[in-house]
Amino acid sequence: QDRVSVIHNYCQGAGIEIKTLRHDENGCINLNDAERARGSCAVYVEQPNPIGVVDDGYPSLKEIIGDNTALIVGIQPISLGLLEAPGNYGADIVIGEGQPLGSPITGGGPIYGIFGCTKPYLRLMPGRIVGRSIDVDGKEAYCLTLSTREQHIRRHRATSNICTNETLIALMGAM
């Protein structure tokens, strides 16, 4: 519910209308009701959903809402060891919290977010993007990728400003 509260806070201030889709008797999204979302700018769902149900209707959801409506999926990263990857059922944007991947809160933070998207949204992403590559010795390497010079030299033009400790934790989680 925390993510939904954040969505409401941002959308209310921007004058964006939010429609809530109904669930069926099993706690899954009502696919008949999902037709109302066609033509919206985006649909946000969580997997597992906010009441803990693994919703098997999401693969049909993208077909119902259409390609012009972004499907945004909030995930619990540990669950992806068992559940299908959201990209496989048409998610355009995937978000989650990286803390369960080895950033113990007992260490005093910091924590990091997970944010993935399809190619059309890639250059619109804020923050730092960790990419996997191969170094000069042929070994797997992780690096910050697709960051513009403004991120580092022009604070007023940067899309985000994060500090080194968060970057180190994000790199650790990516590995």
Predicted regions and their residues:
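Buried hydrophobic positions in well-ordered alpha/beta secondary-structure cores of metabolic enzymes
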Residues: 7-8, 34, 43, 76, ...
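Active-site phosphate-binding strand-loop segment of PLP-dependent enzymes
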Residues: 19, 23-78, 100
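Conserved active-site segment immediately N-terminal to the catalytic lysine
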Residues: 87-103
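Active-site C-terminal subdomain of aminotransferase-like
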Residues: 101-175
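Substrate-binding/gating loop at the entrance of the active-site cleft, primarily
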Residues: 1-12
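Active-site cavity-forming subdomains of large catalytic enzyme subunits
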Residues: 7, 16, 131-132
